[in-house]
Amino acid sequence: MARTKQTARKSTGGKAPRKQLASKAARKSAPSTGGVKKPHRYKPGTVALREIRRFQKSTELLIRKLPFQRLVREIAQDFKTDLRFQSSAIGALQEAVEAYLVGLFEDTNLCAIHAKRVTIQKKDMQLARRLRGERS
């Protein structure tokens, strides 16, 4: 049978709620030990997978603009003092940097999977860069 989307409907009477048994009511009304409710925690990896799906759907830049701009200006100071940048130039640099990093992390993840692991490590990133020919 095909699934259909469930929509909320206004109640038009129907059955009255059943009364709870005495033991159930006593259990619910009695305070639990300590009285402090633990905060809800997801299983390890659940939030990570949710974030992966969210970021794969999105197209916005992930590195904050101002810290990236400060870093670019700091690096540029080593080459020439009093350099000025158009905002579009810094935007283009940021797009290129993020595209490079996403590709590097994809290759790093493949290296970790090849080693039968799910966690990326420093050696995976080193191998990915070496295979790309960026570092010998």
Swiss-Prot record:
SMART domains: H3 (SM00428). Core component of nucleosome. Nucleosomes wrap and compact DNA into chromatin, limiting DNA accessibility to the cellular machineries which require DNA as a template. Histones thereby play a central role in transcription regulation, DNA repair, DNA replication and chromosomal stability. DNA accessibility is regulated via a complex set of post-translational modifications of histones, also called histone code, and nucleosome remodeling. This is Histone H3.1/H3.2. PROSITE patterns: HISTONE_H3_1, HISTONE_H3_2. SUPFAM superfamilies: Histone-fold (SSF47113). The modification N6,N6,N6-trimethyllysine is found at K5, K28, K37, K80. The lineage of its organism: Eukaryota, Fungi, Dikarya, Ascomycota, Saccharomycotina. The keyword Acetylation applies. The modification N6,N6-dimethyllysine is found at K5, K15, K28, K37, K80. The modification N6-acetyllysine is found at K10, K15, K19, K24, K28, K37, K57, K65. The modification Phosphoserine is found at S11. Gene3D superfamilies: Histone, subunit A. Pfam families: Histone. GO terms for biological process: fungal-type cell wall assembly; rRNA transcription. InterPro entries: Histone-fold (IPR009072), Histone_H2A/H2B/H3 (IPR007125), Histone_H3/CENP-A (IPR000164). The modification N6-methyllysine is found at K5, K10, K19, K24, K28, K37, K80. Residues 1-43 are annotated as: Disordered. Phosphorylated by IPL1 to form H3S10ph. H3S10ph promotes subsequent H3K14ac formation and is required for transcriptional activation through TBP recruitment to the promoters. The keyword Acetylation applies.
